[in-house]
UniProtKB/Swiss-Prot annotation:
Binding, a divalent metal cation 1: 63, 102, 213
Annotated residues for binding of a divalent metal cation 2: 64, 209, 213
Record note on pH: Optimum pH is about 4.0. Activity strongly decreases above this value.
The protein's name in its UniProt record: GTP cyclohydrolase 1 type 2
Organism, as annotated: Helicobacter pylori (strain ATCC 700392 / 26695)
Subunit structure, as described in the record: Homohexamer.
Entry keyword annotation includes Cell membrane: no
Keyword Nucleotide-binding assigned: yes
Enzyme type, top EC level: hydrolase
GO molecular-function terms, A-Z: GTP binding; GTP cyclohydrolase I activity; metal ion binding
Temperature characteristics of this protein: Optimum temperature is about 35 degrees Celsius. Activity strongly decreases above this value.
Length: 243
């Protein structure tokens, strides 16, 4: 069996952990880097079902950190203690690739591979396409088609969009750096974000946190396959449903 630290070295080379935001907790979340692992599982999020199905001595690589904020208590009856208990009992290690991976891989996948936009410029966590000059309705139609969804929550502040900005996951707060006639495509848009953006003449399209990042596991699997690691992809449905 291989060691966790060997995979950490590969992942750090491709997406340095030092690139993560100061508030993030990417890296080894559970286990020891000197632990041996039996197989690798990649997933966007560690759900209770994924934890229960995880093989003994597995290494799980996840996008969202299981331990995000400092824990004052570890209660195995509530999240994340309920999942941590299962993982520890199975000797499962967990590596998180969060905002560092957003910057190096996932944002590009969201904007280019998934939504098919090119000519993108990096600006912090955002990718920006200047002088896109696209009609808002056509933009929404294109994104719905790319994501395979029938509806999207939007703020339409202008009919013609000059500049586009992309932030996978939860990036609605970043619209403040944009100019009027821009449109930010991201997830987790809140009511007050929408109100403020509208007052500034900035449009928003909520592509949802789930849909903007669901390609994570496949990207990681393809990367590790090139280093001769076999990876099992664990997918799950968006927990938020429109009924």
């Amino acid at each position: 069996m291989a060691l966790v630290k060997e995979v950490l070295v590969v992942l750090n080379r491709l997406s340095p952990f030092e690139l993560q935001e100061s508030w993030d907790n990417s890296g080894l979340n559970v286990g020891s880097e000197n632990s041996e692992f039996s197989e690798i599982v990649a997933c966007l999020e560690i759900t209770l079902k994924i934890a229960l199905n995880a093989p003994q001595n597995a290494l799980i690589i996840t996008h969202h950190p299981l331990i995000f904020k400092p824990l004052k208590t570890l209660n195995d009856e509530i999240y994340p203690g309920n999942i941590l208990k299962i993982l520890i009992q199975k000797n499962v290690s967990v590596i998180s690739m969060h905002t560092n991976f957003d910057k190096t891989h996932l944002n590009k996948h969201f904007a280019h591979a998934l939504l098919e936009f090119d000519g993108l410029v990096e600006k912090g966590l955002m990718l920006v396409k200047e002088n896109a000059n696209i009609e808002f309705d056509a933009l929404v139609k294109k994104i719905k088609s790319s994501l395979g969804v029938g509806s999207l929550a939007c703020v339409k502040s202008s009919q013609t969009i000059k500049d586009l900005a992309f932030v996978c996951g939860s990036g609605a707060s970043m619209f403040s750096s944009l100019k009027a006639q821009s449109c930010l495509i991201t997830g987790d848009v809140k009511y007050h974000d929408a109100m403020i953006a509208q007052s500034l003449g900035i449009s928003l399209i909520d592509a949802t946190h789930y849909y903007s990042e669901r390609g994570f596991a496949l990207i990681v699997a393809e990367i590790l396959h090139s280093f001769n690691y076999l990876v099992t992809i664990e997918n799950f449905k968006n927990p938020l449903q429109i009924i």
